[in-house]
């Protein structure tokens, strides 16, 4: 069939369907005939990009489809049962065709689709056999269109159409054919920064829905299903937006809700390996702000003789989450630059000192004794994570090396070059950190040598770092061991 003849047959069918749907002048036989013709067009449009491009070459077809969308399910809906069913089926066919075509070319606005969906909801009972089938197509239509356009200022319309309709949301939640494209639609819409800004500043309904769905999903499973993956992609966009920090401040940091959100934040932050600098800066804003808050609270509780164990547990949970996020993002140079700019090393050393002095080291020898001590504070894993963060800040930075010595952080890290069951791997992390602190820094090396001379540094710990103390001309000096020299060759 020639291209012109092909288009002509499609436009003739579309106009005929328009007449049936909008003018209510046809009989049952006309409806059936149009259904058959429309079905063939829908089938062809789902299989061939070339076919879709050909029938979209003339603006006439999109205009007809948009007119049908804008005027259907209003006053022209037939009341006779058979005709009503055929009306819905014809409309579903038009939606299927529009769904297929919109991935090739945008010819309709989101508002037209959402408005048509609302009219459909008002006119068609949920018990109708074609209700769910048609609703699926509406949502697929929205999902397809959202792939090629990031239309702005539609958050309020989405909330009005979907989230204020509890019955509709219940149907979506219990039907994978709806739930999947709906999640894809929201993910695509929230890829637009302006829409995200709307969600985070004006109406956070979509954000809270995403959090609720993530709570139900098994996002810790390595083999994520497609729905969970879509939710994670959506939340990645959210937490990496510059306004998320302000939204998070609206949540009481002492609430269970805050802790629940922070757990999700941790999973999402640590699940991605290719954050860009803009995203990193946005995330570090809320991570570091909250780290400062929980660091101060932690120090206050640990230094107090009277405290609430439940509060300590809650604060500890949130602090671990924030330190884990900083540790994971430490692989990015932008993170290092951010933390250096905000002088994070001072707070890290301050917190490390308080935890080190307030919480007893746990070993095989004293484990039972510590556990039996009533009211003994436990704050596991914190020191290990702090030292890991310090290590990546120190690495290759003479300025941070100097600050660590001046702020007496160097001896703190040295004091942790030993096994502590409260902090798995702290010995290994501390040894790496000390290596970075001593690398090409004579003042730090001399400082450690002087400490060793006063017998305040463990010889074995120094050897593991790759250094040993020697006396030269009556002066105590730190030198690399032969093994360390060989490793560097």
UniProtKB/Swiss-Prot annotation:
Annotated coiled-coil segments of the chain: none
Keyword entries, A-Z: Cell cycle, Cell division, Cytoplasm
Query: Pfam family example for this protein?
Result: Atx10homo_assoc
Q: Which InterPro entries match?
A: ARM-like, ARM-type_fold, Ataxin-10/CTR86_families, Ataxin-10_domain
Q: Which domain of life is it from?
A: Eukaryota
> Main localisation, per the record?
cytoplasm
Biological process (GO) annotations held by this record are:
cell division
Tell whether Electron transport is among the UniProt keywords.
no
Q: Which family does it belong to?
A: Belongs to the ataxin-10 family.
Q: What does this protein do?
A: May play a role in the regulation of cytokinesis.
Protein name as it appears in the record: Ataxin-10 homolog
**Organism of origin:** Debaryomyces hansenii (strain ATCC 36239 / CBS 767 / BCRC 21394 / JCM 1990 / NBRC 0083 / IGC 2968)
């Amino acid at each position: 069939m020639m291209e012109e003849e092909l288009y002509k047959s499609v436009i003739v069918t579309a106009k005929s369907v328009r007449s049936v749907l909008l003018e209510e002048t046809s009989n049952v036989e006309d409806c059936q005939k149009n259904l058959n013709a429309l079905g063939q067009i829908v089938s062809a449009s789902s299989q061939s990009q070339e076919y879709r491009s050909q029938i979209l070459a003339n603006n006439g077809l999109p205009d007809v489809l948009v007119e049908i969308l804008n005027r259907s399910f209003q006053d022209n809906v037939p009341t006779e049962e058979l005709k009503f069913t055929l009306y819905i089926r014809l409309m579903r066919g038009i939606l299927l065709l529009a769904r297929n075509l919109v991935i090739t070319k945008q010819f309709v606005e989101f508002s037209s689709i959402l408005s048509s969906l609302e009219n459909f909801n008002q006119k068609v009972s949920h018990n109708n056999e074609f209700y769910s089938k048609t609703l699926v197509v509406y949502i697929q239509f929205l999902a397809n269109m959202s792939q090629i356009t990031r239309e702005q200022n539609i958050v309020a319309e989405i909330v009005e159409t979907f989230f204020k309709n509890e019955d509709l949301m219940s149907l979506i939640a219990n039907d994978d054919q709806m739930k999947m494209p709906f999640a894809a639609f929201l993910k695509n819409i929230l890829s637009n920064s302006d829409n995200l800004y709307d969600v985070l500043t004006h109406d956070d309904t979509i954000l809270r829905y995403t959090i609720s769905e993530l709570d139900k999903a098994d996002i810790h499973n390595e083999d994520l299903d497609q729905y969970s993956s879509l939710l994670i992609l959506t939340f990645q966009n959210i937490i990496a937006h510059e306004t998320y920090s302000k939204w998070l401040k609206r949540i009481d940091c002492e609430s269970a809700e805050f802790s629940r959100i922070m757990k999700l934040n941790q999973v999402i932050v640590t699940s991605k390996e290719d954050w860009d600098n803009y995203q990193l800066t946005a995330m570090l804003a809320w991570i570091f702000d909250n780290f400062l808050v929980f660091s101060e609270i932690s120090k206050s509780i640990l230094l107090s003789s009277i405290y609430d164990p439940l509060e300590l547990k809650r604060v500890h949970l949130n602090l671990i989450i924030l330190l884990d996020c900083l540790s994971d993002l430490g692989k990015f140079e932008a993170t290092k630059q951010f933390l250096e700019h905000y002088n994070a090393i001072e707070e890290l050393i301050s917190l490390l000192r308080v935890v080190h002095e307030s919480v007893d080291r746990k070993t095989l020898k004293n484990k039972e004794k510590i556990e039996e001590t009533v009211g003994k504070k436990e704050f596991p894993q914190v020191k290990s994570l702090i030292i890991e963060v310090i290590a990546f800040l120190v690495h290759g930075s003479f300025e941070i090396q100097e600050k660590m010595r001046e702020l007496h952080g160097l001896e703190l890290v040295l004091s942790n070059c030993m096994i502590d069951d409260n902090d798995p791997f702290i010995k290994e992390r501390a040894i790496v950190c000390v290596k970075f602190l001593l690398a090409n820094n004579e003042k730090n090396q001399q400082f450690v040598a002087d400490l060793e001379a006063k017998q305040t540094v463990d010889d074995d710990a120094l050897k593991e770092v790759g250094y040993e103390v020697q006396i030269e001309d009556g002066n105590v000096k730190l030198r690399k061991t032969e093994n360390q020299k060989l490793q560097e060759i």
